[in-house]
Curated annotation (Swiss-Prot):
Reactions mediated catalytically: RX + glutathione = an S-substituted glutathione + a halide anion + H(+)
Residues the entry annotates as binding glutathione: Y10, R16, W41, K45, L53, E70, S71, D104
InterPro entries (UniProt xref): Glutathione-S-Trfase_C-like, Glutathione-S-Trfase_C_sf, Glutathione_S-Trfase, Glutathione_S-Trfase_N, GST_C, GST_superfamily, Thioredoxin-like_sf
Protein name: Glutathione S-transferase class-mu 28 kDa isozyme
CDD domains in alphabetical order: GST_C_Sigma_like, GST_N_Sigma_like
Organism annotation: Schistosoma haematobium
Residue span, GST C-terminal domain: 88-211
C-alpha cells in the first residue's frame, strides 16, 4: 500500500469509521479524512459503492481505484496488513474474541441513536442498568487474561482500538458511568496511549463530535 492515496469517507463523527482511522494512525499510515455533512450526503451517496458509509477509496500510483466498504472488514484488512491482528493463532483468536465482545457493547449504544430525546434517555437508563455492566464485566475478564499490558499481549492490535472506540461511546451516554469502576478498562487505555504516541496525539487532537 506504499505510495497509495487512502481516503476514509464518513460523516463528521467517530461512529463506525473510528476504528479504521485509529488503525491507520497506529500503523503510521497517512490518509485523507473526508467528512461529509448530512446535508451533502444525498448527492454524494450515488458515488459510493453500496451507498453506505464508512467507505475507503484507495488510489494507486497509476490512478487505479479500489473501493472498500463494511467498517469492520476494512479495519480488519488494514490491521492484518500492518500486523495488528496478533502474532499467533491464539493471539488472533483473542483479538477476534475481544472485537466481538466490544461489538456486543456497541450494539447496546446504537439502540440510543436517532431516537426522540425522551425515548433516548429511557433507553440509556435501561441499558446502563441492564446489559452494559454485564458486557463490561466480560470485557474486563478478557483484559485480565491478557499476557501483556494491552488487550492481547504487548503489541497494539485491532482489539485495543475497537475497544477504546466503544468505551468512548459508553462515556457519551453517561460521562460518570465508568468513574471508580472497571479498573481494567481504565488501565488498558492508559497502557495503550503509552504504547502508541501517535495514537495518543491523535486522540488528544481529535475534535469533539456528537457520535
Amino acid at each position: 500500500m506504499t505510495g497509495d492515496h487512502i481516503k476514509v469517507i464518513y460523516f463528521n463523527g467517530r461512529g463506525r469509521a473510528e476504528s479504521i482511522r485509529m488503525t491507520l494512525v497506529a500503523a503510521g499510515v497517512n490518509y485523507e479524512d473526508e467528512r461529509i455533512s448530512f446535508q451533502d450526503w444525498p448527492k454524494i451517496k450515488p458515488t459510493i459503492p453500496g451507498g453506505r458509509l464508512p467507505a475507503v477509496k484507495i488510489t494507486d500510483n497509476h490512478g487505479h481505484v479500489k473501493w472498500m466498504v463494511e467498517s469492520l472488514a476494512i479495519a480488519r484488512y488494514m490491521a492484518k496488513k500492518h500486523h495488528m491482528m496478533g502474532g499467533t493463532e491464539e493471539e488472533y483468536y483473542n483479538v477476534e474474541k475481544l472485537i466481538g465482545q466490544a461489538e456486543d457493547l456497541e450494539h447496546e449504544y446504537y439502540k440510543t441513536l436517532m431516537k426522540p430525546e425522551e425515548e433516548k434517555q429511557k433507553i440509556i437508563k435501561e441499558i446502563l442498568n441492564g446489559k452494559v455492566p454485564v458486557l463490561l464485566d466480560i470485557i474486563c475478564e478478557s483484559l485480565k487474561a491478557s499476557t501483556g499490558k494491552l488487550a492481547v499481549g504487548d503489541k497494539v492490535t485491532l482489539a485495543d482500538l475497537v475497544l477504546i472506540a466503544v468505551i468512548d461511546h459508553v462515556t457519551d451516554l453517561d460521562k460518570e458511568f465508568l468513574t471508580g469502576k472497571y479498573p481494567e478498562i481504565h488501565k488498558h487505555r492508559e497502557n495503550l496511549l503509552a504504547s502508541s504516541p501517535r495514537l495518543a496525539k491523535y486522540l488528544s487532537d481529535r475534535a469533539a463530535t456528537p457520535f
